[in-house]
């Protein structure tokens, strides 16, 4: 029987990658792990208790909040505040960043940005959902409350990023800039066990993930790329396969393992794109680049964008490097 390595053991073993590590980042990821277990438990009971459906409230983007959105947001926020390694959080479900005011939190080095439950509208139909997180070192003085500037940093300043996918099994996938590693939750032991070490996305793939129902509203370059994907060219392994779940974490996870591209372009309704730069695009971009892939807005590298507001949106193209380069060629050629 092969040796079982837990997430906690793996993080401790990797601390030597950080010359000035004091264990705080490891403990922070432990807080995320704890909240993930709690949220996973509720998701698994979703059909049995009154936790599914809309809450009746809207978030700052004007989107209907699901009951589990609020539940997950509260659990992750509490877990991060209670361990004292985080001075503040910004969440897709919060209008503004939240500064933790306990003295120990003010002395913390890190801020966390998160989408506590991506794809939550799929809960009612038992489709995979996820949590996305991003960790930065604060830039405001230690000992003071967190400021908005701590959160408005470009993605290339992230010290860690990851996601949890709640599906047929629950997995936590993360990077600290030294490879992408996946851990599968063993409910009988109550631990995340290393199952996918040093994950790499294939340079090419034959899967494209996009909501083609919005085709008429896409930029011309995206329309032309989709025609390219659908052409019958057996020598080039085309046509490609269309796979779109409607949950970013689930689509991204499949493409990471199998090779592919995820596209969420601008549309007439969302000229700046729909996905959030800070809560969704930056962490996924860090992960994909660490795995050998690529992420772009169609105009620039996602990780090089300097955000101007917490809920900023951008077009998003992410996946296998050759596929992202190909769609970029179409975007450049067919500029509207």
Curated annotation (Swiss-Prot):
Classification via CDD domains: FBPase
GO MF annotation terms: fructose 1,6-bisphosphate 1-phosphatase activity; magnesium ion binding
Catalytic activity: beta-D-fructose 1,6-bisphosphate + H2O = beta-D-fructose 6-phosphate + phosphate
Record keywords: Carbohydrate metabolism, Cytoplasm, Hydrolase, Magnesium, Metal-binding
InterPro entries membership: FBPase_C_dom, FBPase_class-1, FBPase_N, FBPtase, Fructose_bisphosphatase_AS
GO CC annotations on file: cytosol
Localization of this protein: Cytoplasm
UniProt: Mg(2+) 2 binding residues: 115, 118, 280
Subunit description: Homotetramer.
NCBIfam families: PRK09293.1-1, PRK09293.1-3
Protein name: Fructose-1,6-bisphosphatase class 1
Organism: Aliivibrio salmonicida (strain LFI1238) (Vibrio salmonicida (strain LFI1238))
């Amino acid at each position: 029987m092969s040796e079982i390595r837990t997430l906690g053991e793996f993080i401790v073993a990797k601390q030597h990658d950080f010359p000035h590590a004091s264990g705080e980042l490891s403990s922070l990821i432990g807080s995320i792990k704890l909240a993930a277990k709690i949220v996973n438990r509720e998701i698994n009971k979703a059909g049995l208790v009154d936790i599914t459906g809309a809450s009746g409230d809207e978030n700052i983007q004007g989107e209907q909040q699901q009951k589990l959105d609020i539940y997950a947001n509260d659990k992750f926020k509490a877990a991060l505040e209670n361990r004292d390694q985080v001075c503040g959080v910004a969440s897709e479900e919060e209008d503004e960043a939240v500064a933790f005011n306990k003295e120990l939190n003010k002395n913390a080095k890190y801020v966390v940005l998160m989408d506590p439950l991506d794809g939550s509208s799929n809960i009612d139909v038992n489709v995979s959902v996820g949590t996305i997180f991003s960790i930065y070192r604060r830039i405001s003085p230690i000992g003071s409350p967190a400021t908005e500037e701590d959160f408005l940093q470009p993605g290339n300043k992230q010290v860690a990023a990851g996601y949890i996918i709640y599906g047929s099994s629950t997995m936590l996938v993360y990077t600290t800039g030294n490879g992408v590693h996946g851990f599968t939750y063993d409910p009988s032991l109550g631990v995340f066990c290393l199952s996918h070490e040093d994950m790499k996305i294939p340079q090419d793939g034959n899967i494209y993930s996009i909501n083609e129902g919005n085709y008429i509203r896409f930029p011309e370059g995206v329309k032309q790329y989709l025609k390219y994907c659908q052409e019958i060219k057996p020598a080039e392994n085309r046509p490609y396969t269309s796979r779109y779940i409607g949950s970013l974490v689930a689509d991204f996870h499949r493409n990471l393992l199998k090779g592919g591209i995820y596209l969420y372009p601008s549309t007439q309704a969302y000229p700046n794109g729909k996905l959030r730069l800070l809560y969704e695009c930056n962490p996924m971009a860090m992960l994909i680049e660490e795995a050998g892939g690529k992420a772009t807005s169609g105009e620039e590298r996602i990780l090089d964008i300097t955000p101007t507001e917490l809920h900023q949106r951008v077009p998003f193209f992410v996946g296998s490097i050759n596929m992202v380069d190909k769609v970029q060629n179409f975007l450049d050629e067919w500029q509207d």
